[in-house]
Amino acid sequence: MAAPKRKKSKAKTAMRKAQWMRKLTVPGLSLCPECGQPKTPHRVCPHCGYYKDKEVVEVV
């Protein structure tokens, strides 16, 4: 099994662990055609309950 030849510094370890944060992307938002509120694509609108011009969930 491979073993490191030198100890990784705290800075190198922190840089490696911080890389996942740079890879994150903000989820795209689209506007609901029924109510005009922003929603995530391919999901039921949480404000009006519509998906593809059909009421899927009854929102009170």
From Swiss-Prot:
GO molecular function, one term: structural constituent of ribosome
Keyword Calcium listed: no
Coiled coil: none
GO CC entries: large ribosomal subunit
Domain of life (superkingdom): Bacteria
Alphabetically ordered keywords of this record: Ribonucleoprotein, Ribosomal protein
Annotated GO biological process: translation
Protein family membership: Belongs to the bacterial ribosomal protein bL32 family.
Protein name as annotated: Large ribosomal subunit protein bL32
Taxonomy of the source species: Bacteria, Pseudomonadati, Aquificota, Aquificia, Aquificales
